[in-house]
Amino acid sequence: MSRLGIMVLTLLLLVFIVTSHQDAGEKQATQRAAINFRWKRSLTRRTATEECEEYCEDEEKTCCGEEDGEPVCARFCLG
């Protein structure tokens, strides 16, 4: 194979490697953003009122927030 052919194949390989690396970085950033959104949502959901805490305390559980106006009780709040 001529030197020109080898150089062209090398350049094509480098372009492929660079673009696949960029795609992986974008995918990772998207996943990170989704995780951050879930984390913020779970923190928002964990805010509890005193009424909810008292209700769940009677059941010896933790108040994880309210859903449709009803207290949500569990041993551990997972979000």
Swiss-Prot record:
The keyword Kinase does not apply. GO terms for cellular component: extracellular region. It is found in: Secreted. Keywords: Amidation, Cleavage on pair of basic residues, Disulfide bond, Knottin, Neurotoxin, Secreted, Signal, Toxin. Expressed by the venom duct. The keyword Signal applies. GO terms for molecular function: ion channel inhibitor activity; toxin activity. Pfam families: Conotoxin. Residues 21-44 form a propeptide. It comes from the Eukaryota. The modification Leucine amide is found at L78. Disulfide bonds join C52-C64, C56-C73, C63-C77. Residues 1-20 form the signal peptide. The presence of a 'disulfide through disulfide knot' structurally defines this protein as a knottin. The cysteine framework is VI/VII (C-C-CC-C-C). Belongs to the conotoxin O3 superfamily. This is Conotoxin ArMSGL-0122. It comes from Conus arenatus.
